[in-house]
Amino acid sequence: MKGILVAVSPEGIIGKNNSIPWHYSADLKRFKRLTTGKTIIMGRKTWESLPIKPLPERRNIVITRSSIEGVECFQSIDDALQTCEGDIWFIGGAGIYEEAMEKADIIDMTLVPDKVNGNNCIYFPKIDETWKEGKTNQLDNHLKLKHKMYTLSLIHI
């Protein structure tokens, strides 16, 4: 399985000023549960925004043109994928998500209610017709958060 794991505002925003503009422990716990023991692939700015580096109990991979001490780095997602076994999560940012849309099997999306505006906002890429939208459900009994899955349309597989 290769999946995109993302939290998105109603405006489609995934970040602002190189950070996530909301904090929900239910979403963070879910992120940890889904990614522990798996490979996570991210861009350099996502890596730099992490409060703990590397994220423990996961194989951390950063896509960057330069090397970063303490983490595996590759110049492309394709180069990284050649070294991966098992489940893989693409965890951001926007450029990684854009490229991962052609490589992933699922999009696992948390819908946050927070309205975000202003400058320096980062948006999730457009989800095209190759993806089939699933139902929107409440996330883990959390009153504010919703969850939605997208899978590749059988027509396009």
Where are these regions (language model features)?
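Enzymes that bind and transform nitrogen-containing heteroaromatic metabolites
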Residues: 1-155
